[in-house]
């Protein structure tokens, strides 16, 4: 039986998590968001909170850290100190590959589109929306005060873009990297699930 793997990348406030959960329910397959974080925390020994927030702190990449490799005083062998954000990414990537190998799933965020880019059963979706609509959702549905919502939207989207660029070399939200791009301000949540 063919697997159905759907990855969902999304702008903050576009309703991606809700859409992912509803889509998975409609298809009768599991949805992974927080579970990726929990499993990656187990594998890496890092806290789930650190892994969950790593996108906002993405300032360096594995390739940068390779250039910072140092010799230890105990051995003449070159050793690499892997930055914690890189360790978190690698742990999440391993979990995402395991999920996809196990069977059908909806996987939200975490560069899953890039990690599974060569999987023939994967469909990659990017969800975006009009700024005002996303702000409304952040305020009304997430319960964030208006002024804080504006700053959160800016910071989280910037963090996601930096994180994506750091680990994929590509531009987050670039339509050429996805199979489907939907403006949830136009489709609404039910329309996005139906699409």
Task: Enumerate the language-model features and the residues they cover.
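Glycine-rich phosphate-binding P-loop
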Residues: 8-24
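Short beta-strand-centered segment that lines the nucleotide-binding/catalytic pocket of NTP-utilizing
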Residues: 30-41
């Amino acid at each position: 039986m063919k697997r159905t793997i759907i990855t969902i990348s999304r702008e903050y406030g576009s309703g991606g998590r809700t859409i992912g959960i509803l889509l998975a329910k409609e298809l009768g397959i599991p949805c992974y968001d927080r579970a990726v974080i929990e499993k990656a925390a187990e594998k890496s020994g890092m806290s789930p909170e650190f892994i969950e927030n790593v996108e906002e702190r993405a300032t360096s990449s594995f390739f940068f850290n390779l250039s910072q490799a140092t010799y230890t005083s105990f051995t003449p062998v070159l050793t690499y100190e892997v930055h914690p954000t890189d360790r978190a990414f690698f742990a999440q990537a391993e979990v995402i590959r395991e999920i996809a190998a196990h069977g059908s799933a909806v996987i939200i965020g975490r560069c899953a589109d890039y990690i599974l880019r060569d999987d023939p059963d994967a469909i990659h979706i990017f969800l975006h929306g009009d700024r005002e609509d996303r702000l409304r959702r952040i305020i009304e549905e997430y319960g964030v005060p208006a002024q804080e919502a504006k700053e959160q939207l800016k910071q989280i989207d910037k963090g996601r873009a930096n994180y994506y660029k750091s680990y994929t070399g590509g531009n987050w939200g670039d339509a050429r990297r996805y199979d489907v791009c939907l403006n949830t301000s136009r489709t609404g949540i039910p329309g996005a699930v139906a699409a």
